Regions:
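Short strand-turn-strand beta-turns centered on an Asx-Gly dipeptide
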Residues: 26-27, 231-233, 274, 293
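Cysteine-centered loop/knuckle micro-motif
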Residues: 49-53
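Short Cys/His-rich micro-motifs in 6-15 aa windows
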Residues: 54-60
Length: 303
């Protein structure tokens, strides 16, 4: 087709092309001649030369796909979620959880892989919602998860509503308590590092969480602490808490920015998981324990 005119609808993702072009097979044989086609940008009909209206139910379809993966503990293939719809899918998933009686208790912060031509992997911060149903008391059933990884983190409890982006100097005005935490990262796409839009749609791969005893935030120099993760009481990794964003308190600042951009307000008493200080540990049955010097520890049994 010569001199095509192309328009993409920013809301639906559909692409309107003015002109006539031919759809051919691998051998160059013409399958169909299409005039002024409307190409589907939703990602669900990539094998079709024209829009089949799939995008109308896109959010519901992908949300259900990810919810089924979680419920059945069976990985699904990433669909290459379109950016604007990723946020809608994350929100819809939370709404569905709340509709069945779960309660929102906070968010987890972490990094997601960006699409890039660079040899080195590039990541950007994202968040996922946490509900009370994700909290581990003493035991975790590994059979309910897909590709669980155990990560050592710091957990922050909010003293007041986090309703805007804050600075590092303001953190203690917003955080009342801290605790050691273990996040179980569980990607619904299996043991892969998903690209950012798929990761957002998957609620930042939130699986399960364990939280230790709360201590007052101002009474501990968190930047001078070390965080260790043990498997069956054998030390697996030990790092400075500065492995979290260069300063663990910065995790709250970063989270506040992402939440503000998304229009999300976390009420007082909510929690924020910092993002992992350690490399994720592929989980097998056994005891997992995280310790933060001067703060405390948390543990659970995986079966």
């Amino acid at each position: 087709m010569s001199n095509p005119s192309i328009f993409q609808n920013p809301k639906s993702g559909s692409i309107k092309v003015d002109g006539t072009f031919q759809v051919v097979d691998a051998e160059g044989k013409v399958i169909k001649t299409v005039t002024d086609p409307k190409l589907c940008g939703c990602g669900l009909s990539q094998d079709k030369p024209f829009c089949d209206k799939s995008h109308a139910n896109y959010v519901s379809i992908v949300t259900r796909m990810l919810e089924d993966a979680r419920a059945n503990a069976k990985a699904v293939t990433p669909v290459g979620v379109w950016n604007m719809r990723a946020y809608e899918i994350r929100k819809r998933s939370l709404e569905n959880r709340l509709a069945v009686g779960e309660n929102l208790i906070g968010v987890k912060f972490g990094g997601a892989l960006l699409k890039s031509d660079s040899v080195e992997k590039c990541y950007e911060g994202i968040f996922g919602f946490l509900t009370d149903a994700m909290q581990i008391e003493t035991e975790l059933n590994l059979g309910s998860l897909i590709a669980p990884l155990a990560e050592a983190e710091v957990v922050f409890k909010l003293a007041k509503d986090l309703d805007r982006s804050i600075s590092l100097e303001e953190v203690f005005d917003f955080v009342s308590h801290i605790a050691p935490g273990i996040e179980v990262f569980d990607c619904r796409y299996g043991a892969i590092d998903p690209y950012i839009d798929d990761a957002i749609a998957d609620n930042a791969c939130a699986g399960a969480i364990a939280i230790g005893t709360w201590v007052e935030a101002k009474s501990h120099d968190l930047t001078a602490s070390e965080i260790s993760i043990f498997v069956n009481e054998s030390l697996n990794q030990k790092v400075s808490t500065k492995a979290i964003a260069g300063n663990p308190w910065q995790a709250v600042v970063n989270a506040s920015e992402k939440l503000a951009n998304a229009g999300v307000v976390l009420p007082a008493g909510s929690i924020i998981f910092s993002g992992s200080a350690t490399n994720g540990i592929a989980m097998q049955p056994g005891k997992y324990r995280v310790e933060i010097t001067g703060v405390g520890e948390v543990s659970f049994e995986a079966k």
